[in-house]
Amino acid sequence: MSALVYFSSSSENTHRFMQRLGLPATRIPLNERERIQVDEPYILVVPSYGGGGMAGAVPRQVIRFLNDEHNRARIRGVIASGNRNFGDAWGCAGDVIAQKCGVPWLYRFELMGTQRDIDNVRKGVNEFWQQLSRSA
């Protein structure tokens, strides 16, 4: 299986989700001056910001990470978290990234996710990588 890369704000909701998921993952640093590069294909797990609108939905750290061509070339899919209070815009960072990077939006979960979300993502990630390897 290939990599998961995620960002979590100081609320740690996405981080707790990733810990419960139990799959190898790399965290995009909260400090915007710290940079990472990913050398293998990955699925990005990202929270949505901005109170429900598209403007500001993608965290700045994630924008900076994806503006690095090395990292952008390796993204294969996106999973988004959000808050259902934002209505139709909940998890919209995933929609924005999927469109801009030309990758599939794979899943959306609320806040820290439920056990069902954990199970669905674990299964979906495995199936996604298997499907990609068969089509390569």
Swiss-Prot record:
UniProt GO BP: protein modification process
GO terms of molecular function: FMN binding
Superkingdom per UniProt: Bacteria
Pfam families assigned to the protein according to its UniProt record, in alphabetical order: Flavodoxin_NdrI (PF07972)
Family: Belongs to the NrdI family.
Family annotation (PANTHER family): PROTEIN NRDI
Known function: Probably involved in ribonucleotide reductase function.
Protein name listed in UniProt: Protein NrdI
